[in-house]
Amino acid sequence: MTDTTAKRRRRKDARPAEIINAAMDVFVEHGFAGAKLTDVAKRAGVAKGTLYLYFETKEDLFRATAREALTANLVAVEQSSAAFNGSIVDLVPVLLKRAAGRMGDGRVPGIVRMVLAESRAFPDLARIWHDEVVARILGRLTELVSAAQDRGEVRAGDPGLFAISIVGPMVLGVLFQEVFGSDSLHAPNLDMLATQHAETVLNGLLLRSGGH
């Protein structure tokens, strides 16, 4: 394989990621309804026909975008939790800090806002976001809480509801910034929220001596 051929192969392999990155910007700026595939192709520096080689519909492109939006955080959660053998006391603060870092990417909250705003007109948006992001996060957290209950660390209760309690305030913090602006007097600092909430939620989750 010549150097030129190798460069072309690398360029071709990078195209899906470049298209997804461009699509994320376009979706955030224009919403799902207003996003045009021609704009995505132009921003990605490819022909519109090239885009269709990888994504047949705008819904397919959004699915890939939704997956990419939180991939780094999801993989970190899944890998960290899979290899983790310690207490949930040590794991929850790490996971929330990583979530805060990923949510700090302005495009991720923008995608969330778009889903909330347009899911009634485009029900598939909510379904895609649920399947690619929400279900994976809550599913893994539920498993972690259930395992901690089996070890006698976490009090009795529905582990799925506990999982929502863990991530809920972080989601609310992101939505607050998106709706009211990060310059609001009450807009939460996500890193500080992650630290304080980890302490608060663990204080409620942990089983104390005496079984309470």
Where are the regions that the model predicts?
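C-terminal peripheral helix-coil segments that are non-catalytic and often amphipathic
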Residues: 1-6, 94, 98, 135, ...
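Basic, helix-initiating cap at the start of DNA-binding domains
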Residues: 1-46, 53-60, 86
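Hydrophobic/aromatic residues within well-ordered alpha-helical segments
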Residues: 15, 58, 65, 69, ...
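Amphipathic alpha-helical segments enriched in hydrophobic/aromatic and basic residues
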Residues: 20, 27, 32, 36-37, ...
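Residues in soluble alpha-helical coiled-coils and helical-bundle/repeat scaffolds
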Residues: 28, 42, 56-60, 64, ...
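Short, flexible, glycine-rich and Lys/Arg-enriched loop motifs at helix boundaries
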Residues: 67-88, 176-189
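Hydrophobic alpha-helical connector segments
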Residues: 78-112, 160-166
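Short secondary-structure transition hinges
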Residues: 101-143, 184-187
